[in-house]
Amino acid sequence: MADITDIKTILYTEKSLNLQEQGVVVIQTSPKMTKNGLKEVLREYFGVTPVRINSLKMDGKIKRFRGREGQRNSFKKFYVKLPEGVSLESSEA
């Protein structure tokens, strides 16, 4: 089962801020999160039922440091369409 700890952050980029005007929130999560898991977390912790969820898998970039290769962490990005007039504010605040 998915947990709130699997959500890393809500992304605030130029693209995501433009999408917020249309009621879409961009959420970065761990790679094991699923659409149904995210829907459960949003219902349980935020009291919001999303209209639509699109997911995107982002592989970690390969970076070099002092001659050695390493890889940044992979993550999933979700585009969550919320009902009109609803925002993500924690019900446990």
UniProtKB/Swiss-Prot annotation:
The keyword Transit peptide does not apply. It comes from Campylobacter lari (strain RM2100 / D67 / ATCC BAA-1060). The gene is rplW. One of its GO terms (molecular function) is structural constituent of ribosome. InterPro entries: Nucleotide-bd_a/b_plait_sf, Ribosomal_uL23-like, Ribosomal_uL23/eL15/eS24_sf. Belongs to the universal ribosomal protein uL23 family. One of the early assembly proteins it binds 23S rRNA. One of the proteins that surrounds the polypeptide exit tunnel on the outside of the ribosome. Forms the main docking site for trigger factor binding to the ribosome. Part of the 50S ribosomal subunit. Contacts protein L29, and trigger factor when it is bound to the ribosome. GO terms for biological process: translation. This is Large ribosomal subunit protein uL23. The keyword Electron transport does not apply. Keywords: Ribonucleoprotein, Ribosomal protein, RNA-binding, rRNA-binding.
